[in-house]
């Protein structure tokens, strides 16, 4: 106990020495200094015991604390020296900031955005861009379509554009023209000239404008060609000039230096020309835009585009009227419904819709109504019947092997004689006169007489050497006839009515779709009155139609047959020529060779001539020989 009391002052001294070595701003603990004497033994002993225990712990703990504190101080000092947030180091320590770089986009802002706006903005001065009245002729160098809001011009040709404002803009205002692509997939590309025009000598020599610029200003030395350093877009700027006295427009002459179809340039991509009214600081006071096309023929392209636009408008209006029908929901057919067969037509999209067509004129309306009814009836006809009809039409439309003469058609040859010879109408039946006599040994020549023998046309020779097989075959009649009406060689309606002396009535028939005499064969006089034909022509036309019906048969008239001795000259009937042009022969020239025996010799008596029907006394008295007369054409 005494030893402990004796060592107490030494322990207190050691603790005070250690305590004094600590920093005064320690935040861990604070011990009061010893101010008591040795008279408080119990308290000193308690304190010495406390110090004794703290002596062993404080030696190691405080040493570690000092080491940790010094390390933290060094780290904090290093961090503070490199931190830009400390105000005392902010001015001295250089920082790697993008704002301090001279090439930063934030340091020098672009006067134009990356994607320029093409929305019309009249602004406070009611900025407008107009064009003069232009022509759509092919020779025009430029033209403007108000319908499409599109400018068409030739390359390097002057295109005047008028600028109008309601109030004068501030001094220093300029007008900028900039081309941009119209479509969204091309709008980020810069519009430039193609390499061919940019590097060529044409339109580049002696020009102050850069070769790559598409738009140039003509006749203004104050124009400036701007290449944006950020977006790369090219534009031309001219100072705004107020309109002259007596005018309300300021005209600027622009040139477009590359075609829209140039490869490597615009390459057929549509462009917009943006005209802006700007101040010196780039503030936009007004904006107008229009589409531009640089081509070789502005008038032609404008007309084609406007026609296409009108067609699209008509289709859009038609679809808008029938919008309810076109928006029907698709319904799948139930499994029980059979699939469409091969003979059933598949309707295209829109076949069930109803469309409207405006027609001017009653006659045009009636024609279109007939077409409509025909098409509707066509849908009711079975497809096999339609195919059969088309095959028949193709057979009827095959060209004939014989070329018709210049003044009348010829009958095509027959391949078969339908119904036999007894069923074919003879020449006498065709002409409508009875034969003078009939004989099995002589052909039925009917009313063939001297008058008919003198008519013009090809002769039909009778060859005695022809066999029966040749006589049974159908021969082609080479008669070139010019028959008078109503037996007209041309089946057209015009020739028929002209032959009747009624050319003024042609329009009454053609307006109703009647183009051939075959369409008139079933008309009555009441039908002619319904067609509004004048009364003075009705009876004439009706009689002509009756003569046609009685004169020849359209379905059987085919061609003339001839034989050497007993063949009947007739026209064969065939259904294959129902719609071909049929010529009806009215006048014939027949040459028949008569062999007269030489009975006028010394041994010939007068009674030998009785069977020939000659006046024998006159022949003997005058001694006139019987001669056969031939024309020069027949001799050669």
From Swiss-Prot:
The cross-references to Pfam families, in alphabetical order and at most eight, read: P53, P53_tetramer, SAM_2
Tell me the protein's name.
Answer: Tumor protein p73
- Localisation per UniProt entry: Nucleus; Cytoplasm
Give all Phosphotyrosine modified positions: 28, 99
Region annotation (Interaction with HIPK2) maps to 345-380
Which segments constitute the SAM domain?
485-551
GO terms, molecular function: DNA-binding transcription activator activity, RNA polymerase II-specific; DNA-binding transcription factor activity; DNA-binding transcription factor activity, RNA polymerase II-specific; DNA-binding transcription factor binding; identical protein binding; MDM2/MDM4 family protein binding; metal ion binding; p53 binding
The protein's required cofactor(s) are namely: Zn(2+)
Q: How is the cofactor bound?
A: Binds 1 zinc ion per subunit.
Which purpose does this protein serve, as stated in its record?
Participates in the apoptotic response to DNA damage. Isoforms containing the transactivation domain are pro-apoptotic, isoforms lacking the domain are anti-apoptotic and block the function of p53 and transactivating p73 isoforms. May be a tumor suppressor protein. Is an activator of FOXJ1 expression. It is an essential factor for the positive regulation of lung ciliated cell differentiation.
| InterPro entries assigned | p53-like_TF_DNA-bd_sf (IPR008967), p53/RUNT-type_TF_DNA-bd_sf (IPR012346), p53_DNA-bd (IPR011615), p53_tetramer_sf (IPR036674), p53_tetrameristn (IPR010991), p53_tumour_suppressor (IPR002117), SAM (IPR001660), SAM/pointed_sf (IPR013761)
Q: What is known of its domains?
A: Possesses an acidic transactivation domain, a central DNA binding domain and a C-terminal oligomerization domain that binds to the ABL1 tyrosine kinase SH3 domain.
Native organism taxonomy: Eukaryota, Metazoa, Chordata, Craniata, Vertebrata
Q: Where is the composition biased (Polar residues)?
A: 94-104
Enumerate the UniProt keywords alphabetically: Activator, Apoptosis, Cell cycle, Ciliopathy, Cytoplasm, Disease variant, DNA-binding, Host-virus interaction, Isopeptide bond, Lissencephaly, Metal-binding, Nucleus, Phosphoprotein, Primary ciliary dyskinesia, Transcription, Transcription regulation, Tumor suppressor, Ubl conjugation, Zinc
Q: Which disease is it linked to?
A: Ciliary dyskinesia, primary, 47, and lissencephaly: A form of primary ciliary dyskinesia, a disorder characterized by abnormalities of motile cilia. Respiratory infections leading to chronic inflammation and bronchiectasis are recurrent, due to defects in the respiratory cilia. CILD47 is an autosomal recessive form characterized by onset soon after birth or in early childhood.
Give the originating organism: Homo sapiens (Human)
Which part of the chain holds the cross-link Glycyl lysine isopeptide (Lys-Gly) (interchain with G-Cter in SUMO2)? 627
Q: In which tissues is it expressed?
A: Expressed in striatal neurons of patients with Huntington disease (at protein level). Brain, kidney, placenta, colon, heart, liver, spleen, skeletal muscle, prostate, thymus and pancreas. Highly expressed in fetal tissue. Expressed in the respiratory epithelium.
Gene (UniProt): TP73
